[in-house]
Amino acid sequence: MTIMDIDDHSRLRDLAVSLIRQAAEGYSPKYGYGSMSCAAYDTAWVSLVAKPFNGIKKWLFPQSFKFLLENQENDGSWGRQTSPVDRILNTAAPLLSLQRHAREPLQLHDVCEDGDLDDRIHRATLSLQRQLSDWDIASTAHVGFEIIVPALLNLLAAEGLCFSFKAQDELMKVNAAKLKRFDPEVLLYGKHKTTLLHSLEAFVGIIDFDKVVHHKVGGSFMASPSATAAYLMNASCWDDEAEDYIKNVLVNGSGRGHGAVPSAYPSSNFEYSWLLSTLLHAGFTAKDIECPELCDVAGMLENSFIEGQGTIGFARSISSDADDTAKAAFALNKLGYDVSVNEMVKEFEVKNHFQTYPSERDASLSANCNTLLALLHQKQVGAYQPQILKCVKFLTRCWWNTDGPIRDKWNQSHLYSTMLMVQALTEFQAILDQKGLPYGLNTVEMARVSICLFQGCLRTMLQQCEDGSWSHSREQTAYAVLTLGQARRLSTFKHLQSQIDSAIDQAATFIRLHSVDLAQQSLPEFIWTEKVSYTSPLVTEAYCLAALKVATSLVDNPGIVGESLDLGIPSRQRIDKYIWLFHQTPLFRSLPEWQLRASFIEGHLFLPIVNEHRLDVFPRKNMDPDDDYIRLIPFTWTATNNRNFTFASPAWLYDMIMVSVVDYQADEFMEAVAGLTFSEDLSMLVGLIQEVLTPYKTEPASPVTSLIDMSSVQCPRAKLSNIASGDIEEVRTCLRRFASFFLDHPAVRNAQRDDRATAWREVHNYLVAHVRHTQDNMRLNLQEQRRWYVSRNMPYFHWVRSNDDIACPITFGFVTCLVPYLVANPTVERAVIGNESESIVTSSDVSFDSVESKYYADDVCRHITNVTRIYNDCGSVVRDATEKNLNSVNFPEFAVTASGSEKQALRAMGEYERACCQAAFQRLEEASLQTATTEAERAKRRRRLDVWKVFLDTADPYGQIYVVRDFTARSVHVRETGIASTAKDVPLVSSSVPLVGGGPMLVT
């Protein structure tokens, strides 16, 4: 039966029932059910089993060895999975089999003594070495790799095949940490079943296999063909039941007699619970899918709960886990059963989250999503409020701190993890709307929930391919549709409903056109993760049917979930007034307006968190009460982050938003408070700056590019200082908070020494440059004529390149530390997500390692700073003259221009600086990638450069919009006294020219 041209609900119901029937019909009372795809890794272990026949030793499963020979790739590897550790495992185990068969051909001497086998071993060895050399262990999440890979390498070494690779020490460090807690007497020889039983092959030569026989169920060890094969090879007595189990897997598993086996068989509970829960969550009712087979499948799950005393594993009578327990409980409760989750809570709840199984290394986002959904669908949901809030906080912490697409150790598609998070958090918000739970979260925590939900849906929408799919994949497209189905319910998407509907319709068309029978399934996607990756045709079809159900169902009252949170989303008309300005700029001109509207809403969701901390550094005394810039700052960052689908983490975005706010406020503070307080003794202000910053100074002394000679900052009308001590202390306190904001940030504290020195230098230069610019303004205003600035004998070129009061350099110094800390740094990511002590966080690596990359990075900073200064001055000639600020056009060189006017000259120089910035960044990219020694390192650096590009691109809209509308706040004291600093940068790094394409839109 195919899923083609499906338009009516009755047809979908028939297909859902048919899928359930197929699942039930494949069930064996003794062995269960499983449709998981085969794996070269487990097949290789099965091929290594030998048995005496009439006193003659023979390979027991020659068909498995034949499968390995038939499926070796030209490059010597096995498996086409994209995950590096998949290819390593699927190559290492078959290589071990080839080597042992070559050493001991037994009855396969015709095959094994052929010279072709030596060539195969040679190619496999070279392939494995390449894979190990490029392996990035820190980003590997596969379960058990830290014990399985070292064990395989040891077995290969015993065969004379030794491997050395860059990440070997790191691997063995992780391995040692895992085995430090390994006690076979407790973990394997006792009565309690642990997940280690699933990987017994990793303990060959370490454990006594005769002491684990009591854990055998249905002939297998935790439904693992490889573990069972290892047992057969190492037990002192032959086990016919274990042999029969492997024979059954070879016949009834997805290999269907061709010699291959999956990594797990049976997988009844997993596949049945995913089948039912997926269909039911998508809107199929118990009545829709009613059939005798539904009762059979549900009954099997119920019996597993009874046998497991309230929890279940992926198959009957094996170790329980939270994931399968939660999925099955959700499905059965939706079908009208009364399944308690009390035992799940008791067994799997830990301090900060729910663990999938005891002693897991890394927490699973998907398992906590499924746990949350199960908790939210309990009849007495309020009884589980502490556990619900724990899950919610964990999920938001995962999303908030994950750089790029979020992934999980049970499924490699980020769309799967995103789908589950969106489903779970949407249900949570719906429960809050219905008053089913007290809020329990503070303002910041609730804002984070809204941000994570919105980003999960929006980023999914933005990644849709032109053919309507995601990654040209049916299953992943189905995940995306289920995500967008939740987006239709959310109040944050009420201004984007038509775009959601269009995306879902296109995706449904793709799924219909590319659907096939289970029996004819082709080109399977190995996105699910076991020891190695696999696919489940049953689960794939369930998701596709669920997606079509969502696509063809009307949503009652769309766009209302979350309304009780009072998020204050502006009206569409008001939003469009803002985005109209941005849409005129070259950077965003080609984007659909709805994408800018979505980015504005995303930025708006950051405001509650920003407002909680906006006064942490500066109290806003004597500041302009109009904080219009606060509404725009988040938008500029979300818009550029979404524009090229960079998707830097919310943690990174928030830090950049707050840096923008604080930079802007510092500009006002240095003008309206510090500049006024010390107007008659600017040298005292410089001394105060030095006092505040000296404790942070990194030794050896950081080179400072704009230190000011004390004599140069004396006020021309200098007299004895008469500054109130309270005023001095106020400035000192604010300067200390400002310094701490930057230099006490974990990213700076954990940065390499050179990067910390850069951050310190730029904070120092920024503050001192403000003092110098105040002096320049004062000197200009004391001249007899104010048209030309002649008090300082400095050419314009040198002046514009020494203006560090522009926010670009200080932000650049901060980003130099922030990018290595938050971008492509799994160590920090795991620690923060796990809510672990900061003391375990290791130092970030250096931002730029070579002399060339350091040079080009500094050059990028200088050029973007120059662009900022030049184009801001171009747009503020009139305002600066009115407010008695020094402007570029006050320099005598502007008396003669080649371009026809002062503004045209500024534009020409701005374009020049822009071109220099582009050229420098291109050189920076090349130099950064050139010193990477592995593909994993190159990928990490590419990712970091992409995030650097967001920082640079955010310079673009500020300058362009600034000349359309001035968002700069001005203090009343400036107008009254005539003492002004620049206050030119609208939030953060302003530039009137895009770094990519087009010229600035300027008001003339």
Swiss-Prot record:
Listed binding positions for Mg(2+) 3 are: N872, D873, S876, D880
Where the record places motif DXDD motif is 321-324
- Swiss-Prot/TrEMBL cofactor(s): Mg(2+)
Where along the sequence does the record place the motif called DEXXE motif?
667-671
> Care to name a GO molecular-function term for this sequence?
copalyl diphosphate synthase activity
Question: What is the name listed in the Swiss-Prot or TrEMBL entry for this protein?
Answer: Phyllocladan-16-alpha-ol synthase
Q: Which gene encodes it?
A: PaDC1
EC number(s) stated in the UniProt entry for this protein:
4.2.3.45, 5.5.1.12
Briefly state the protein's biological role: Involved in the synthesis of labdane-related hydrocarbons by catalyzing the conversion of geranylgeranyl diphosphate (GGDP) to phyllocladan-16-alpha-ol in a two step via type B cyclization into a (+)-copalyl diphosphate ((+)-CDP) intermediate.
GO biological process per UniProt: diterpenoid biosynthetic process
Q: Which residues bind Mg(2+) 2?
A: D667, E671
Q: Which UniProt keywords apply?
A: Isomerase, Lyase, Magnesium, Metal-binding
* Family in the record: Belongs to the terpene synthase family.
**Catalysed reaction equations from the record:** (2E,6E,10E)-geranylgeranyl diphosphate = (+)-copalyl diphosphate; (+)-copalyl diphosphate + H2O = phyllocladan-16alpha-ol + diphosphate
**What's in the domain note?**
The DXDD and DEXXE motifs are important for the catalytic activity.
Q: Which InterPro entries match?
A: Ent-kaurene_synthase_fun (IPR017057), Terpene_synthase-like (IPR050148), Terpenoid_cyclase/PrenylTrfase (IPR008930)
Q: Say which species the protein is native to.
A: Phomopsis amygdali
Report whether Magnesium shows up as a keyword of the record. yes
Q: What is the lineage of its organism?
A: Eukaryota, Fungi, Dikarya, Ascomycota, Pezizomycotina
Question: Where, in this chain's numbering, is Mg(2+) 1 bound?
Answer: D667, E671
